[in-house]
A protein has these predicted regions:
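A short, small-residue-rich loop immediately preceding and capping a beta-strand
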Residues: 6-14, 19, 101-110, 176-177
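Accessory alpha-helical/coil subdomains and C-terminal extensions
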Residues: 37, 94, 102-107, 113-117, ...
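N-terminal phosphate-binding or glycine-rich loops at protein starts, especially the Walker A/P-loop
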Residues: 2-51
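Glycine-rich oxoanion-binding loops at beta->alpha junctions
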Residues: 1, 48-101, 111, 135, ...
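C-terminal non-catalytic interaction/assembly regions of soluble proteins
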Residues: 252-255, 259-429
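Short glycine/serine/threonine-rich phosphate/pyrophosphate-binding segments
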Residues: 16-26, 47-48, 85-87, 106-116, ...
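Short, ordered loop/turn segments at secondary-structure junctions
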Residues: 12-14, 40-46, 78-79, 108-109, ...
């Protein structure tokens, strides 16, 4: 441990509630141990250009009460220093030039991967501690430990959906609500289950590629079942944004007006594709074509929860993580000193440090992603309370008759046999 080395901190990826609490706790603890803290603006963006001016020393005045605020006082960026070896080398050289011997990175899976590669390249010149942040909750933390920001995003999403459910009931129409989450359905399921939404669709329930027709079948079946068995024309369907990651590119490219773009880490820019509007259009067309129109309103939840003020859970949580990052850097523990880089987390209330090597996928070399386990009770309980077509609906003659009647109109009659043949694929397996 060298007391002359400074502690640097940067934020990568999308915003999440609690970022400023990490920066605040880290700054207070590092300064109490006689280390300067240098805040680095816009993630890796300037470091990988060799630019050392977008830095400021942080003191008490910079971070006072900032833990209550959403957003990031250091901004954030998706700049990827791992695309080119020379960019990563430039990051290391710039950190050395600034006298930064300890770097805390706050971010999700992409920032964690960049942090792991920097730690590997630095080989001890700069020790790196990653603080896991994402409202997607998809970093591979042990057990069911959430990433910070998730609980705040879930709470705000829950409140929005609660209001939409009341509007849906009052006006007699459906809402299709797409919830942010690039790969995993944690946030969508967390919101839908807590709010008691009519149904929630997540990518993990599909065993292969996701086809938009199959998603529309699920939605259409739910609308018909609610009408047939409860005489209700309203409902709220929560749909995970990450479904789009599983839709074949050629299928997306055939959709008029869709432009496929990727970010600096190679991910599909999901927010540029309005899945909620697309599904609304497709499902409304199905009902209109048989002469029984249905009213659907599309809504997206994501950006409005990312920079919200953190709830108490996240305020408390990130204070421990910010402290933990400094403790990783400056602890006298010889076992920690052996690690050039690690991810800090809380396990059973204790600070733990996970080696980056254990968090990378052995096949891809990239960060592993934590998906929703659809075999666990948490998902099965959520599914139990959804309104979706089930196997018994197609086997019960009375229910099947009511469903077929709901699917009929003056223009087009649907027999029980027709209905069963049409939707049987949803309940197989």
């Amino acid at each position: 441990m060298n007391s002359n080395k400074h502690v640097g901190v940067l934020v990568g990826g999308g915003p999440a509630p609690g970022i400023n609490g990490v920066i605040s706790a880290l700054t207070l603890e590092a300064r109490s141990r006689a280390h300067k803290v240098l805040g680095i603006y816009n993630g890796f963006e300037w470091l990988m250009k060799g630019e050392a001016r977008q830095i400021r020393e942080l003191d008490h005045n910079d971070i006072s009460r900032s833990h209550f605020q959403g957003g990031s006082i250091l901004n954030t960026s998706r700049a990827n220093p791992t695309k080119k070896p020379e960019d990563l080398q430039r990051v290391l050289e710039t950190l050395n030039k600034l006298g930064i011997g300890y770097l805390a990175t706050i971010g999700g899976d992409d920032t964690m991967f960049a942090a792991s590669q920097l730690a590997k390249l630095a080989a001890g010149q700069v020790r790196v501690c990653h603080v896991p942040k994402t409202i997607d909750n998809d970093l591979p933390l042990p057990g069911d430990i959430p990433t910070f920001g998730f609980e705040t995003a879930r709470q705000l999403g829950f409140e929005l959906v609660h209001n939409l459910m009341e509007d849906s009931r009052t006006t007699g129409r459906w809402y299709f609500v797409v919830v942010m989450g690039r790969t995993a359905g944690h946030l969508a399921l967390g919101i839908g289950k807590a709010a008691g939404a009519t149904l929630t669709i997540i990518p993990e329930e599909f065993t292969g590629p996701v086809h938009l027709d199959a998603v529309c079948d699920i939605l259409e079946g739910a609308i018909l079942k609610r009408k047939a068995l409860w005489n209700r024309a309203d409902g709220v369907a929560i749909i995970a944004e990450g479904l789009l990651e599983r839709v074949p590119a050629e299928e997306l490219s055939r959709i008029e007006g869709v432009r496929i773009e990727h970010d600096s880490y190679g991910h599909l820019r999901l927010a540029e594709l309005d899945l909620a509007y697309l599904l609304k259009t497709l499902v409304e067309h199905r009902f209109a074509s048989r002469g029984s129109p249905v009213a659907v309103v599309h809504k997206n939840i994501g950006y409005e929860v990312r920079s919200a003020a953190p709830i108490a859970f996240d305020c408390e949580y990130v204070r421990s993580l910010g402290y933990g990052a400094v403790d990783f850097f400056l602890s006298a523990n010889p076992e920690l000193a052996k690690l050039n880089g690690a991810l800090v987390c809380l396990i059973d209330g204790k600070l733990q440090y996970l080696d980056f090597a254990d968090l990378l996928d052995s096949k891809t070399g990239k960060s592993r992603v934590r998906l929703v386990d659809v075999q666990k009770p948490a998902y099965k309980v959520a599914r139990e309370y959804m309104i979706r077509l089930e196997k018994e609906d197609l086997e019960d003659a009375e229910k099947l008759g009511l469903l077929a009647e709901a699917a009929s109109s003056q223009n087009q009659r649907c027999t029980p046999e027709d209905f069963r043949a049409r939707f049987l694929h949803l309940v197989k397996g």
